[in-house]
């Protein structure tokens, strides 16, 4: 399913730019899409981060991601309208095996996420980096490191200097933020828009026609669970 969906995204035109002319409707304007994958352990807040950027708010509730899900947002940069797709997968291996090869296809950037209140999620980062290497992502693909839940100051387990050292070792910028409280440290909006500006300057044209609501794949309804920022 993911393969068919992705093929259709890359092979079609955006429907938002059609205009009428003397001979009827002109071909719709082309728009570029950028696929950014968001990876990390379960419960680090990946879904909440993507929801914050695409919907502009913290979700009232969320469900455990099963398989792959993505959200999309159109933004304008230097007069050009582009689409940012944030792909989010389950952090649990049993939900990832059947989808992972599709998840890494045609990736433009990677966001590694850890929970600042959970040292184990930070220690898992090398395994996520290794997974990227195994799927042959080009070395020039932008990568950033995001520590989430910085608003929970009394529960912080991962100090900034430790995270910064790790980021420097892997040539990644570090951001510390909170999907729940956007006023804490690096704003989620600024993080993804900074990445979008960088991608716009370097990546080739890709054509797309995903639905405007942006949420394409969703798990079957399950009881609500806490997003934990």
Curated annotation (Swiss-Prot):
GTP binds at residues 43-48, 62, 65, 91, 148-149, 151, 179-180. It is a lipid-anchor. A lipid is attached at residues 227, 229 (S-geranylgeranyl cysteine). It is found in: Golgi apparatus membrane; Golgi apparatus, cis-Golgi network; Preautophagosomal structure membrane. Pfam families: Ras. A motif (Switch 2) lies at residues 89-108. Prenylated. One of its GO terms (cellular component) is Golgi lumen. It is an enzyme of class 3 (hydrolase). Its EC number is 3.6.5.2. GO terms for molecular function: G protein activity; GTP binding. InterPro entries: P-loop_NTPase (IPR027417), Rab33A/B (IPR041822), Small_GTP-bd (IPR005225), Small_GTPase (IPR001806). Interacts (GTP- and GDP-bound forms) with ATG16L1; the complex consists of a tetramer where two RAB33B molecules bind independently one molecule of the ATG16L1 homodimer; the interaction promotes ATG12-ATG5-ATG16L1 complex recruitment to phagophores. Interacts with ATG16L2; however interaction is approximately hundred times lower than for ATG16L1. Interacts with RIC1 (via C-terminus domain); the interaction is direct with a preference for RAB33B-GTP. Interacts with RGP1. Switch 1, switch 2 and the interswitch regions are characteristic of Rab GTPases and mediate the interactions with Rab downstream effectors. The switch regions undergo conformational changes upon nucleotide binding which drive interaction with specific sets of effector proteins. Although most effectors only bind GTP-bound Rab, ATG16L1 effector binds both GTP- and GDP-bound RAB33B. This is Ras-related protein Rab-33B.
